[in-house]
Amino acid sequence: MGGIMDARRLEDEVEMPLEGIVYGEVSGWLTIIGILVAIAGIIIGVVTGNSVFDYQSTIKDLLSGHDEEKIWTDDSIFHSEPHGYWFLNVIHTGDGIAMFGIALAVYGGIVGLLLLIVFTFRSREVLLYKKGLYTFLAIAIFCLMVYCAWEAEF
């Protein structure tokens, strides 16, 4: 029992850095909201039939081992494999809403990291911690994440 009390006392004494709190809260909540939007989109697509895919054909083709290009060509309203942010053109469908939710969850990390960097610049001590290595790494990771998002092909 003493170990639990010591851990709680230590937890009360440790002050979390504001940068970490901002990153955790923003990325965490955007991820949760994105997941809920994606689940709502799936439910809308299945219940109403307002979908990009013919679900019965898609499941049959998946179980038959067809590749993604054939499934997109045969089972979707596009009749070809879409690229980029295709879901924005069909946001009125269940699949469009679901994919938007997934994108929102992914971009939660990018927005959280951007705010972490902004809050890092508020304090010289935090900015130059470990000779600025952490700040440099945060900026490098942010640039990589933005590049990957920019070049995304869903």
Swiss-Prot record:
Any one GO CC term of the record: plasma membrane
Keywords on record: Cell membrane, Membrane, Transmembrane, Transmembrane helix
Transmembrane segments: 26-48, 97-119, 132-150
Principal cellular location given in the protein's record: membrane
Subcellular location: Cell membrane
Membrane topology: Multi-pass membrane protein
Superkingdom, taxonomy of origin: Archaea
Designated name of the protein: Uncharacterized protein AF_1016
Native source species: Archaeoglobus fulgidus (strain ATCC 49558 / DSM 4304 / JCM 9628 / NBRC 100126 / VC-16)
Taxonomic lineage of the native organism: Archaea, Methanobacteriati, Methanobacteriota, Archaeoglobi, Archaeoglobales
